[in-house]
Amino acid sequence: MGFKRTIGLLLGILLALDQVSVLAQPGRPTFAKRPDIQPNPIQPYKAIPLHSRRNSHKVCYVKPSLNGGDDAGRVEAALRRCNNGGTIVLDKEYSICTPLDLRFLKHVDVALTGKVEFCPELEFWQQNVFQFHFQNASSWWVWGGEDIHLYGAGTGVIHGNGQPWWDAAAGNSSVRRPLLFITDGWHGGSITGLKLRQSPNWHNFIANSSDLLISDMDIFSRSSSEAWASNLDGWDTFRSDNVVIQNSVINHDDDCVSFKPNSTNIIVQGLHCNGSHGISVGSLGNYPYQYDIVSDLYIYNNTMANTTTAARLKVWPGAEAVKKGNPPWVGGGGKGYVRNVTYDLMINDNNDLAIQIDQCYGAINASECLDHPSGVILTNVLFKNMWGTSNGANDPVAGQLICGSADSCDNIRAENVTLTNSSGQPSEWQCRYMDEELLDLGGVGCIPA
């Protein structure tokens, strides 16, 4: 970080201390109280710990800087001042132009009912973001701590100014686009009622976190130029346990939710995903010598519209190789397992495929996977109560359930699954290494893949 920016951040923190009110000021408008939102109807695998009481007199209002200057220092100072039992109110418009490490939070509420916008300074951010080793993820701020409740009450906005990032990446694949929101070690609490707009990359990366409720979110990112707004996952979970994601609307590209390695005990319910790649397990097995685990997922009552695949499991083959893409990917060779995953009550609306099991993810041709079957074993996976329509992209094929070998999949079941093709032809399901007696698929049923 440059000298001028460092000085600016320190000055911002000092100025912010003057702007923070620990006791509510007379005449101050009443801020939105934290909503009482509970997991519903499916309950979490483990009870989410109760929060501690907040001090109603420990309230920090953040006054934005003049002329759209950097508010990072003011925001951090307020969070430090009213940490441990207080509430921070962000009810105005704020610009964040320098990185924020917020992994110190404890027993705190953050009422973000205004707007936080990240400065579109591409060159600066590429040199000054927080880096994660997993898939080159990075972000301009990182949240973490214990018993944190971040809420927007339906009005709060986090805006990533994604358009210049998408435009730049269209002509230069080396541009590293930051993720809009990252948790790293967030244990206990909730994220609710926020509008996430124009993320340069994934919208949310839930990493190394636990006992977290995410609800009533509104995600929208679309490009206004010829540059494609790609890789805009709604949520990616990684090394996280006991998370509920529910009752949200997502309009974007790529996975609506993606369960990355070591995602366990997760509920996803009541989502409406439009234009996505589905609710996906994986991709897994893309790093050699690593053991990926995904287990105990319940995915309930979600509507998938205009997606490539509604329910998707994607794992790499068993040997590392250069894969398709520009620039080419390198992946595969990892091991692990996927266990106890249920997709229940999923409505398909104009989708390419309803179900896709792909143990040859990223490969150039299928023979590569037959020679090197995936080391990620899929067991106890259930698809049930799925119906709706396809868009004809693969007509009459409605789904693909393809395993790499007879040993890499076990107890894959389908119950009451049907899809209506746009042509009116009976649905066909491409299957390989499946116990077809366990598959209640509508239409023709399984055909050879």
Curated annotation (Swiss-Prot):
Active site residues according to the UniProt entry: D254, H277
Cystine bridges: C256-C273, C403-C409
EC main group: hydrolase
Pfam families reported for this sequence: Glyco_hydro_28
Residues in the signal sequence: 1-24
Main location class: secreted
Documented EC number(s): 3.2.1.67
Listed InterPro entries: Glyco_hydro_28, Pectin_lyas_fold, Pectin_lyase_fold/virulence
GO molecular function: galacturan 1,4-alpha-galacturonidase activity; polygalacturonase activity
Protein location: Secreted
Reactions mediated catalytically: [(1->4)-alpha-D-galacturonosyl](n) + H2O = alpha-D-galacturonate + [(1->4)-alpha-D-galacturonosyl](n-1)
Carbohydrate-modified residues: N136, N172, N208, N262, N274, N301, N306, N340, N365, N416, N421
Protein name listed in UniProt: Exopolygalacturonase X-2
